[in-house]
Amino acid sequence: MTCYRGFLLGSCRRVAGGRAALRGSGSGADGRRHLGHGQPRELAGGGSPADGGFRPSRVVVVAKTTRYEFEQQRYRYAELSEEDLKQLLALKGSSYSGLLERHHIHTKNVEHIIDSLRDEGIEVRLVKRREYDEETVRWADAVIAAGGDGTMLLAASKVLDRLKPVIGVNTDPERSEGHLCLPVRYTHSFPEALRRFSRGEFRWLWRQRIRLYLEGTGINPTPVDLHEQQLSLNQHSRAFNIERAHDERSEASGPQLLPVRALNEVFIGESLSSRMPYCWAVAVDNLRRDIPNLKGLASYYEISVDDGPWEKQKSSGLNLCTGTGSKAWSFNINRVAAQAVEDVLHIARRQGNLTLPLNKDLVEKVTNEYNESLLYSPEEPKILFSIREPIANRVFSSSRQRCFSSKVCVRSRCWDACMVVDGGTSFEFNDGAIASMMINKEDELRTVILEQ
């Protein structure tokens, strides 16, 4: 169990404080790309002004699980000593001292956040992933994610109240980019951030999120926490069990609103494809060893965009992102390399008898302009869906490999598929299940913009 000064994780001890209110309103803004550390320059001038300031009376601090803590928990049943853990990590090529150093840096910065809040008379609860639940969110006036972007996604996942602010603080700027966090200067100067909050010297950023409905036959709306449990072998080998028991959920059910909102993205695909970008490599390696016939099945589904006609597709999966997520996995799925742009320009010049001057500057300019067109403001109420490696033949087609939309519906024809939300929460999504994804203003996430 990790100890922070004044707190013992698991006990959720509180620090007494005063009472205050939150004030503010939101409106839309455009943005382009992330630059530097912390919040992106694209947000400069964006968001909406704070109407006065805000000073929360009760704050929950969600601290990330460091790699050192993860390794400890991973082998907790073996009752390893610190020396045993050191030797085990060495066998895997990992540095025990390096992990411990990063852990201490994170812990020190979390303590700085807690002390800063306590000095302002604010009640604080410090929790880890396992203690972070709906009751804790209801108790708090604001949520602080102490870690990196992954911790910010975790903190946001439980907040369904659009008026409750969620603030990210990067606790290890040397190892974490922290796009969704405050600028890194506030990691060590958090009292200054609190003063600026109370004076209203910031802007609100209302990040759009995707809500999900699940309906059809054989659905299971129970979420699986990938970080805590890692998807079990039994769950994903079920489709290959010839003597599979009768599914009691075979009858069709109406639309059910799932208890999560996607801040970055939703990925839909066969389980191996859906897991690889998010889970630890060891889990994937274990699956491959235990189920050798699972070698990356193509995902088979039908898709309808903005209530249009259904289209059958096979691909490596489907990614649906928000403006926040357009800078993450979606960007890397769709971005083009300068080499590809140069080849296309060569062909265009040859086929069109053009006198286009092909030089490095032109190639770089065209490449950057195309890639920047893939990004859009976190406040824009639209979804960008992308088809990964679509299969095109006389049976299957992909009329739009990438497109903006307000609503996307997917009917699964998969055998062992998952619908993964922000890389941390998974839902079964097998044959007969239908997912509907859309943007709703009620799901906005209230975050802040602070200048450097």
UniProtKB/Swiss-Prot annotation:
The lineage of its organism: Eukaryota, Metazoa, Chordata, Craniata, Vertebrata. Signal peptide: none annotated. Inhibited by NADH, NADPH and NADP(+). The modification N6-succinyllysine is found at residues 64, 312, 327. Keywords: Acetylation, ATP-binding, Kinase, Mitochondrion, NAD, NADP, Nucleotide-binding, Phosphoprotein, Transferase, Transit peptide. Residues 1-50 form a transit peptide. Homodimer. GO terms for biological process: NAD metabolic process; NADP biosynthetic process. The modification N6-acetyllysine is found at residues 64, 327, 407. This is NAD kinase 2, mitochondrial. The keyword Ribonucleoprotein does not apply. It is found in: Mitochondrion. It is an enzyme of class 2 (transferase). InterPro entries: ATP-NAD_kinase_N (IPR017438), ATP-NAD_kinase_PpnK-typ_C (IPR017437), NAD/diacylglycerol_kinase_sf (IPR016064), NADK (IPR002504), NADK2_mit (IPR012355). Its EC number is 2.7.1.23. GO terms for molecular function: ATP binding; NAD+ kinase activity; protein homodimerization activity.
